[in-house]
Amino acid sequence: MKIAIVGASGAVGQEFLRILEERPLPVDELVLFGSERSAGRKYMFRGKELTVKLLQHNDDFRGIDFALVSAGASTSREFADTITKHGAVMIDNSSAFRMDADVPLVVPEVNPGDARQAPRRIIANPNCTTIQMVVALQAIERLSHIRRVHVSTYQSASGAGAAAMAELEAQHAELGAGQAPTVEKFAFQLAYNVIPHIDVFTDNDYTKEEMKMFHETRKIMHSDIRVSATCVRVPVMRAHSESVWVETERPLLPEEARAAFAAAPGVVLMDEPADKVYPMPLFAAGQDPVYVGRIRKDLACDNGLAFWCVSDQIRKGAALNAVQILETLL
């Protein structure tokens, strides 16, 4: 099997390399692609040194079986035909094709069969916040249909890229030294602050990030589920957290939900609050599962249930989910 990584030098591209190294996939050849800025860089994979090739409109993708792409929406749109024209399946991490009717949007724990319905040979990876939420929601959906979801996200700096992480670190150092903090990657200082603003605002006063959670959840789950989200950037380096409230068609006991989460693929139950056992980014960073805890009956709605989930948005929220999509196609 011949695999390409497009955007190999970025945070997700580097995670692709690590995950392919870890998992027992039959990779006969791995080809790395990048922009002019990253072309020529060298990385090790399974004992071999690989050089990043410049992504161009040519026949470099001839013979490629799968292309894992994380280079931004504009690059994905521009190069989709180049990547797929010789038969490669493009698994795209950007927002470029997610809501296209003829492009499946896949989370393997939820809708793996959709991956085989890709007439354009493009499969979209959902947004990171959507991925971890639907992995958890699917466990509840198996018990009773979910009518509504309210979710507030606590999204780490790394969701905005490596430069955003560096800025958060720099802000802490600058403030500690009594200096004015550098503010470039976020609308405001993130250190010692939270910012209820991720992506641009839309006409309905929700941000694009929040509307992604609405539209993507419905497409992935093939459901009329209604999702109202508030997405917040918090001064955490890595791993996103979500406070989730669901209304189901029938009342669910917390014990039922715990059992469902414990049995759900991709979920690790951490729900012993009396013993201070609950998910946190501190423990989830660098890990694969979606961690779920703080499961409780809602006090304001008979059919309501609340829980808290945490996951590494670079692994399960991006690179791992894409590799799992590839694995479902083998």
Identify the residue ranges that each predicted region occupies.
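Charged docking surfaces used in two-component/phosphorelay signaling
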Residues: A67, A157-L330
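N-terminal Rossmann-like NAD(P) cofactor-binding subdomain of oxidoreductases
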Residues: M1-L190, R226, V290-Y291, I295-C301, ...
